[in-house]
């Protein structure tokens, strides 16, 4: 007898396909996608891999110190960077889990065992309005330096990109590095101030790109400083943004109405089909109940017992004595005359 190795995670036993029709298509388990790979080996990360101490408390979410001198001016290039094509994959994240912040930064060491999603934000994602796509709580207003998670009172899709080394192809360079994280609506480069503004299609894409490209470099040795952009003071830009929000609202309402109409159609189909099934089950149960009513344990069946009960009730009515008030009419005198 030949020995066969144990089946792997994506292995398929060939003997199960012998009785299948020739046109049968076998769906492989690998359709689920590839697992998320380890971006960083846990053993390669030292315990003191953090920026120089400039405060009293180190914030692991923002990778900087607080409670002391400001460390915002001490920019150092990040050792890690996410590669969406190589690093994306399925994880153990539940359906309502946010995206992995450390995956966006390129330094998640859990891989497919991570409890957060390792992918880009999509249009079907729903995140709590008071949180970003990574599950961090927003604030009512922006920080003074326009850094951090952002504000829940306003939707912002534009990022401020500082620390650029300007050249004539800067717009193309920014497009090449930032289009990996989402659809870009527009890019505005200010050569005199060595900065640029990148506007994404959705706020979730801007949130992901901000964390992915913070402290990264483009084609040179620059270190990017990425923050949230202030509102554009141009009246025409404000009008365009207002029209865009109105279009988004109209499309959202249309999608909701379409979903409601589809659910109503499904419920109507169900309500029409259900009574037919109930009638069939009731009629079948009645047909099955007929022979059981005729056969019963004992001397008499159920129908005979019911007939006897009806006869007994009629007999009681006949044998019931007449009331005393009818006696005087029969004898001709009442009880008072007898006295």
From Swiss-Prot:
Residues 292-311 have a biased composition (Polar residues). Keywords: Cell cycle, Metal-binding, mRNA processing, mRNA splicing, Nucleus, RNA-binding, Spliceosome, Zinc, Zinc-finger. Residues 157-231 form the RRM domain. One of its GO terms (cellular component) is U2-type catalytic step 1 spliceosome. Coiled coil: none annotated. InterPro entries: Cwc2/Slt11, Cwc2_RRM, Nucleotide-bd_a/b_plait_sf, RBD_domain_sf, RRM_dom, Torus, Znf_CCCH, Znf_CCCH_sf. One of its GO terms (biological process) is mRNA cis splicing, via spliceosome. A zinc finger (C3H1-type) spans 94-121. PANTHER family: PRE-MRNA-SPLICING FACTOR CWC2, PRE-MRNA-SPLICING FACTOR RBM22. The C-terminal RRM domain and the zinc finger motif are necessary for RNA-binding. This is Pre-mRNA-splicing factor CWC2.
């Amino acid at each position: 007898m030949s020995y066969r190795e144990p089946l792997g995670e994506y292995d398929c036993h060939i003997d199960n396909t012998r009785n299948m029709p020739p046109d049968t298509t076998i769906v492989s388990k690998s359709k689920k996608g590839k697992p998320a790979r380890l971006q960083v080996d846990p053993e390669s990360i030292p315990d003191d891999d953090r920026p120089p101490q400039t405060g009293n408390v180190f914030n692991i979410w923002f990778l900087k110190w607080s409670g002391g001198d400001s460390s915002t001016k001490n920019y150092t290039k990040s050792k890690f960077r996410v590669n969406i094509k190589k690093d994306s994959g399925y994880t153990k994240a539940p359906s309502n889990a946010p995206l992995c912040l450390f995956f966006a930064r390129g330094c998640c060491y859990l891989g497919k065992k991570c409890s957060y999603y390792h992918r880009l934000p999509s249009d079907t994602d729903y995140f709590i309005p008071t949180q970003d796509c990574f599950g961090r709580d927003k604030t009512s207003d922006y920080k003074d330096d326009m850094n951090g998670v952002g504000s829940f009172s306003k939707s912002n899709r534009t990022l401020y990109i500082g620390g650029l080394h300007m050249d004539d192809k800067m717009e193309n360079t920014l497009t090449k590095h930032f289009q990996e994280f989402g659809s870009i609506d527009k890019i505005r480069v200010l050569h005199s101030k060595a900065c640029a503004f990148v506007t994404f299609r959705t706020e979730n894409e801007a949130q992901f790109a901000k964390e992915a490209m913070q402290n990264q470099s483009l084609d040179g040795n620059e270190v990017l400083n990425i923050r949230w952009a202030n509102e554009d003071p141009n009246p025409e830009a404000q009008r365009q943004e207002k029209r865009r929000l109105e279009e988004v609202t109209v499309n959202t309402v249309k999608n909701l109405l379409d979903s409601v109409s589809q659910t109503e159609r499904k419920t109507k189909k169900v309500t029409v089909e259900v009574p037919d099934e109930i009638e069939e089950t009731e009629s079948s149960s009645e047909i099955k109940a007929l022979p059981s009513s005729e056969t019963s344990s004992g001397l008499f069946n159920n129908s005979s017992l019911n007939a006897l009960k009806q006869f007994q009730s009629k007999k009681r009515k006949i044998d019931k004595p007449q009331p005393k008030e009818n006696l005087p009419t029969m004898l001709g005198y009442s009880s008072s005359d007898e006295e």
